[in-house]
Amino acid sequence: MKKSFIHQQEEISFVKNTFTQYLIAKLDVVEVQGPILSRVGDGMQDNLSGTENPVSVNVLKIPNATFEVVHSLAKWKRHTLARFGFNEGEGLVVNMKALRPDEDSLDQTHSVYVDQWDWEKVIPDGKRNLAYLKETVETIYKVIRLTELAVEARYDIEAVLPKKITFIHTEELVAKYPDLTPKERENAITKVFGAVFLIGIGGVLPDGKPHDGRAPDYDDWTTETENGYHGLNGDILVWNDQLGSAFELSSMGIRVDEEALKRQVEMTGDQDRLAFDWHKSLLNGLFPLTIGGGIGQSRMVMFLLRKQHIGEVQTSVWPQEVRDSYDNIL
């Protein structure tokens, strides 16, 4: 039992370390330290889809402030790039750990505990566009494939990912599968191509509903791109044979500029956020134009090691029935 546990931990570490090294080299970012707490009221917390309640923390020696465990570091990263004067094409990555206790489903792929490679880069001049988004997606996908090949060589786990990732807009997807739910559309298209980047998540589609929810103040999901499509963000999805479904590895995008921020908070009714320090800084031109995202660490390990449950590669909390159903939950 001990030997099996140690081997399991060695596999997890190998995937994480290998991916980290490739990501830093290929994406050209530096690894930095990030926070676990965010001060309430500065606007730095990631509100995700807008419905999740963060974990509140009171610090004894700072009685006049309340803090929250971060959901992600989407806004902190952009603030940090500005604070330390990162130049165009430069960026950072954080080994981010977070808690999302309002996760509405604790299942094979969702956990209260979130670990990500949280990265952000300053966009080169003239490249705040769909082409640069796709170029960055292809770089990250290359890192995923290189890591998969390293796992194959070390553990004899057959590589399954296609050489290229396929791009498709959410508007195209709803037109192609009008009678399916968003999740069913993801399953259908990802099963065909093996690896897909789904572009434009957050805005209302022709069927009157968004593909999925996104906060209005980090990704740009409203800017028109091509053929009347909208959105400069998206998800990297791969086909997971163990689960028989599409499997999200990363959510990422070009971040809002001043106009996209104002447009999106008006659409979602979140204009009050513009009073926060972070949002004021953006509107006053103090932040660089950036692209960024989060790549799920446990999800990546789960996929590349062909595990059935995310609890096999991370230590979290689970209902007893989950522990009873899977032998290798950590």
Swiss-Prot record:
Keywords, alphabetical: Amino-acid biosynthesis, Asparagine biosynthesis, ATP-binding, Cytoplasm, Ligase, Nucleotide-binding
GO BP terms, alphabetized: L-asparagine biosynthetic process
Pfam families: AsnA (PF03590)
Any single Gene Ontology cellular-component annotation: cytosol
Molecular function as annotated in GO: aspartate-ammonia ligase activity; ATP binding; catalytic activity, acting on a protein; transferase activity
EC supergroup of this enzyme: ligase
Pathway: Amino-acid biosynthesis; L-asparagine biosynthesis; L-asparagine from L-aspartate (ammonia route): step 1/1
Highest taxon above the source species: Bacteria
Principal location: cytoplasm
Family stated for the protein in its record: Belongs to the class-II aminoacyl-tRNA synthetase family. AsnA subfamily.
Entry-linked PANTHER family: ASPARTATE--AMMONIA LIGASE (PTHR30073:SF5)
Protein name: Aspartate--ammonia ligase
Gene source species: Streptococcus pyogenes serotype M2 (strain MGAS10270)
Gene: asnA
